Amino acid sequence: MKEKDFINTIKTVLNSPLIGDDCAYLASLGIVVTQDSLVEDVHFSTSFITPFQLGWKSAMVNISDICASGAEPKYLTVALSLPKTIEADFVEEFYKGMKAACGKVEIAGGDITGSDKIFISVTAIGKCGDRRISSRKNARAGHKIIISGNHGSSGAGFRLLKEGKQTPESLIHAHLMPEAQVEFSKKIASSIKENYAMMDTSDGLADALSQIAEASGVSMEIDFSKIPYDKEIEIFSDFEDLILFGGEDYGLVAAVPEEITKDFTIIGEVREGSGITILKQDKKFHLSNAEVSEKLFNHFN
C-alpha cells in the first residue's frame, strides 16, 4: 500500500472538508495548522546531520507548510522522542537550531519522551490576518505558474552526504539547512485578490505541480528552461531528474492570475486537461499524475 492510499483511506473515514492541503484552514479562528514529523533513518541520519542542523530543519519544514498556505508563521510546538543514550548537549543544540530557524516564530511548548530512535513531531500555527489563504484546488486554466527557490539542490546534497562528501557546500547546505520562502509567501498572500493555489516543493517540484493539477482538475504546462537551479547540481548526469523529483528544496510553486506575476519567476501556465506537460528544447513530454506518483519517494515501499 502506498502513502497516497493511506491518505485517501483517512479522508474517506473522516470525511472532513479541512483535509486536503498541507495546512488545515480554521477560518472561524483565523488560523492555519500543520504537523510534520522527522524520523531517524527515514528522514535523516545522525551520521551526517548535527543536532543544531536537525533542530533548524525540523522548524523550517513546518514553517514552509505555513508559508505554502499564505499565512504568517507564528507558533510551533515540539514533541521530541529520544533514545536513552542521548546526552543533554544534543537537546541543547537541537533547540538552539530550532530557535535560530524560527526567528520571530515562537516555540510555545511541546513534549519529550523516550524511544528507540529519534522522532520529532512539530505542530505549526499560522495567523491568517488579512492574507488570502491558498488551496491546491484553486488553480484555473489561464493562471500563470510562478516559483521561488532553486530546485534539485537538496536532493543533490543528500546524495553527496551519502557518498561521504562535503562539497559543493551550497548543495550540502541546501539539504541540511533549508530555508522557508517567507517573503515570497507574504508578497503573494498580502496582495492577491482572487483564489489561488500554492504548495511547497518538499516532495519534489513535479509532485507539487501534479498535486495541484489533480486537485484542481487542470493540466500544468512547464517550460523546463525557466526553472531556477544551482549549476553545481550538473555534476550529476541526471540533474534534470533531481530538479523535478529530488524533493526537500522547500521552494514554493503557485498558480496565480497573470496580473500579480510582476517580479516573480514564471515557469509555465495552467491549461485544460490533466497531468504535467514539460516543454524542453522544442519537445513536449507529458507526465500523468499517476506517472509522477510512481517516481516519488514512498514511505511504505
Question: What are these language model-derived features?
Answer:
Residues 1-50, 69, 74, 78-79, ...:
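Extreme N-terminal cap/leader segments of soluble proteins
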Residues 18, 32-35, 106-110, 124, ...:
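General beta-strand structural signal in soluble alpha/beta enzymes
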Residues 38, 72-159, 269:
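Glycine-rich anion-binding loops of enzyme active sites
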Residues 51-75, 96-101, 187, 191, ...:
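Small-aliphatic-rich amphipathic alpha-helix that forms the alpha element of a beta-alpha
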Residues 83-86, 160, 175-248:
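Active-site-proximal betaalpha loop/short-helix elements
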Residues 125, 253-257:
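Short hydrophobic/aromatic beta-strand micro-patches
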Residues 156-173:
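Short, compositionally biased
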Residues 263-301:
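Acidic, Ser/Thr/Pro-rich beta/coil linker or hinge segments at domain junctions
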